[in-house]
Structure formats: structure tokens, C-alpha cells
UniProtKB/Swiss-Prot annotation:
Function: Catalyzes the oxidation of F420H(2) with O(2). May be involved in O(2) detoxification, reducing the intracellular O(2) concentration to a level allowing growth at the expense of methane formation.
Lineage of source species: Archaea, Methanobacteriati, Methanobacteriota, Methanomada group, Methanobacteria
UniProt EC number: 1.5.3.22
Swiss-Prot/TrEMBL catalytic activity: 2 reduced coenzyme F420-(gamma-L-Glu)(n) + O2 = 2 oxidized coenzyme F420-(gamma-L-Glu)(n) + 2 H2O + 2 H(+)
SMART domains: Lactamase_B
Protein name per Swiss-Prot or TrEMBL: Coenzyme F420H(2) oxidase
Length: 404
């Protein structure tokens, strides 16, 4: 096959893979993504930074061949940099090793075990393990490594090219699939929304590590040298401070006067309550988002929770327990640990036909997830006007608390 590499800067090409078709990746909904790989040409050596998902070797190689042809160079890779073990960035490493057997594979020490577990065919391969500050000289260009454990796997690392380009792997990524490669080539609201969704679903529990890593980068004197951030998914940041400032805001829990209302319903009673709560919150001037779990996806929901000061979560009771879709969301929220970016208020609500008690379970699970749970509003069967008025007032109180 034929495919074109995208020249990003002198001696630097994007040689990744466009996945137009993917719609779900480990529970995260998306409209396609990219698996970004980069070829760096020095006077004496060539490095490939990261690779792509299993089954995409031909597309990756076609772009690499185009880059070598345009540079007028023999197709030879001297270094393979594996910033992260996960299969969407290492999935064709075995094929690359067979194609370029002399290429040194550079990764963290923790990554070696993970790569061998994922790819037993690499058993016996000599890996070059690196630590923060280690570097490789390509001839006129130097790649320096920066360990980044748990951003977002224990094996993760960043690679810095001395011309000012940070290859950050998953950090600063977005699940977008556009033929354009740069941040400035697509609408900013689409770019930032995708980056926010990526952070909310993948980086939120690691927020304290994000801030510590920023401090480390400053101490190493690299922050002012970063002129471009090239992540492993989505667009390349040519204005890197834009995403660094956004990550700082998200990691420190900067929120808006905003209430996210989330519910599921069987016979529309809980839906009536949800809409009344939303109206109450809006009456206090809050920005409000309403999600219906029967139709809406949790990865979109948590994107709005990220910058909300409060949430309202509603479910009908089934045998005195929350509706299953709400239980699923509660487990997801517990894993994301939103309290690590500051505590958010929460209320729970729902309708019941028996003894009730589902709201008590929801309160406990939300507290376990790090939310400051205020109150529960549970009604019997269909809410009457008086009960809907009470829901409206609950929404007002929830939004009013944002002014405290």
C-alpha cells in the first residue's frame, strides 16, 4: 500500500496510523483516533518513536518508506523508542524488530517485563533500558528521556528532542481522527473538548502526578524549551502552553458554576425529578448539563463532571438497589477518584415502589468516590406537584452552594 508521511519539522515526520473506524476502546467512546508514531532523522542515525495498533504494520511502513524517500535516505532505523507498553503504541513492535533487527529498542526498565508479557516473540531481545536524563545522539540531534511512571502506566516515559519537541505519549492526547496533524488545523473547540474528555477519563486519578511532573520538568529546565508537544493520539500541539494550562486547571480542580444532572428511569418518574432539579439549578444561574444514561455514554458524562462544582445522580430502585446503569457509573466514578482534583458536591434522587433504599446505596458509593454528598430525595412511585417543587428547591440549593 501507499501512504504519505506528514513532515512536522526539519528531519521530523509523522508516520502514524489513522483509525477511522474505532468507536469504543476499553469503554471509552470515540469517533476514530490516531496512533501517532514519529521518525526523527539525525546526521548519523534515525529513531522511530512509538508505533501502532496490532494489524496496522503495512500503513506504518508505507508512511515510513515515504519519509525515507523524501529525505533521500536508505531505509534504516537505528533506534526504536518505546515510550509505553500499551498495545495501541507497541502493537507492531515484533514486526518492526524483524524488519530492523539491528535497531536498539529503548524503554524503561519496567517496560521490559510488560513488553515480554504482551509479545513473547521478543524473548531474548536485548532492550536498552533508560532513566531520566539518559539520551541518545542521532548526529546533530539528541533525544533525552524522562521517566513518567503512572502517566498513565507504570512503564510510561516521555522523550525530548533538543529542537524543543516533547514526545509525550498518551499525556496531552485526544481521540480524534483528522487528516490534519496540527492543533491549529482544526477548530479549537473540537480540539479542547477532545483533550478534556481524554483527561477526564484517563488522567483524572493521576492529577497529583501531573502537577508533580510539571514541577520536575521546570526543575530540569525543560518547560521553557518546549516548543511543541507531540502526543501519541490526535493533534500535535504547536502552542503547548494552551494544553499545559488546561491540564493545570483540570489537575487543580478548577470548576465552574455548573451542575451535571445524570439519571436513568423506567417509567419516567425519575426523569421528572431530574428535569425539576435541573430547572432549579438553572434558576440560580448555574450552567446545567443533563444526561440520560439509557442513551448517553459515561465517557461523555465524566467530561462534564470534570469542571462541574456539583452533580445530581438519580435512579429508580430495583429490589431496593439502584438501576444497573447507575451502578455502572458509580463504579466508574469510584475508579476516577475525582476528589483528587478537589471535592465536588453531590445529591441523589429517585423513585421507588417498595421499601426504597437505593438512594442510600448511591450516597455511600458517591462518598466512596470522593464526593461531598448532601442529601437524598426518594419519592414513592410518580412525583406529584409538591414533590416536584421539592426537587426544584433541591436543585436551587445545589446550585446555590456554588456561591459559598
Amino acid at each position: 500500500m501507499k501512504a504519505r508521511a506528514e513532515k512536522i519539522a526539519d528531519g521530523l515526520y509523522w508516520t502514524g496510523v489513522l483509525d477511522w473506524d474505532i468507536r469504543n476502546y476499553h469503554g471509552y467512546t470515540l469517533q476514530g483516533t490516531t496512533y501517532n508514531a514519529y521518525l526523527v532523522f539525525g546526521d548519523e542515525g534515525v529513531a522511530l518513536i512509538d508505533n501502532s495498533y496490532p494489524g496496522t504494520f503495512q500503513e506504518l511502513m508505507a508512511r515510513m518508506e515515504d519519509a525515507f524517500n523524501r529525505e533521500g535516505r536508505e531505509m534504516r532505523v537505528d533506534f526504536i523508542v518505546q515510550n509505553h507498553v500499551e498495545r495501541d503504541h507497541s502493537g507492531v513492535l515484533v514486526e518492526l524488530h524483524r524488519r530492523f533487527p539491528e535497531a536498539e529498542i529503548h524503554c524503561t526498565e519496567v517496560a521490559v517485563e510488560g513488553l515480554l508479557k504482551h509479545y513473547p516473540a521478543l524473548e531474548g531481545t536485548e532492550f536498552r533500558t533508560v532513566k531520566t536524563g539518559d539520551s541518545i545522539d542521532l548526529g546533530g540531534r539528541t533525544l533525552t528521556f524522562l521517566e513518567a511512571p503512572l502517566l498513565h502506566w507504570p512503564d510510561s516515559m516521555f522523550t525530548f528532542l533538543d529542537t524543543g519537541i516533547l514526545f509525550s505519549n498518551d499525556a496531552f492526547g485526544q481521540h480524534l481522527c483528522y487528516p490534519q496533524r496540527l492543533d491549529t488545523e482544526i477548530p479549537e473547540y473540537i480540539l479542547m473538548d477532545a483533550a478534556k474528555k481524554f483527561y477526564a477519563n484517563l488522567i483524572t486519578p493521576l492529577s497529583k502526578l501531573v502537577l508533580r511532573k510539571f514541577d520536575e520538568v521546570k526543575e530540569l529546565g525543560l518547560l521553557d524549551k518546549i516548543g511543541m508537544i507531540a502526543p501519541s493520539h490526535g493533534q500535535i500541539w504547536t502552542e503547548p502552553m494552551k494544553i499545559i494550562e488546561a491540564y493545570t486547571a483540570w489537575a487543580t480542580g478548577k470548576v465552574k458554576k455548573k451542575v451535571t444532572v445524570i439519571y436513568d428511569t423506567m417509567h419516567h418518574s425519575t426523569a421528572m425529578m431530574a428535569h425539576a432539579i435541573a430547572e432549579g439549578a438553572m434558576s440560580e444561574g448555574a450552567d446545567v448539563r443533563v444526561y440520560y444514561l439509557h442513551e448517553d455514554d459515561r465517557s461523555e458524562i465524566v467530561k462534564d463532571i470534570l469542571d462541574s462544582h456539583a452533580i445530581a445522580l438519580g435512579a429508580p430502585a430495583i429490589y431496593d438497589e439502584p438501576y444497573p446503569s447507575v451502578g455502572d457509573l458509580l463504579m466508574y466514578l469510584r475508579g476516577l477518584k475525582f476528589n483528587r482534583t478537589g471535592q465536588r458536591r453531590a445529591m441523589v434522587f429517585g423513585s421507588m415502589g417498595g421499601r426504597g433504599g437505593a438512594t442510600g446505596t448511591m450516597q455511600k458509593l458517591l462518598a466512596d468516590a470522593g464526593f461531598d454528598v448532601m442529601e437524598a430525595d426518594e419519592i414513592y412511585y410518580v412525583p406529584n406537584n409538591e414533590e416536584l417543587d421539592a426537587c426544584f428547591e433541591a436543585g436551587r440549593r445545589l446550585a446555590g452552594d456554588l456561591n459559598e
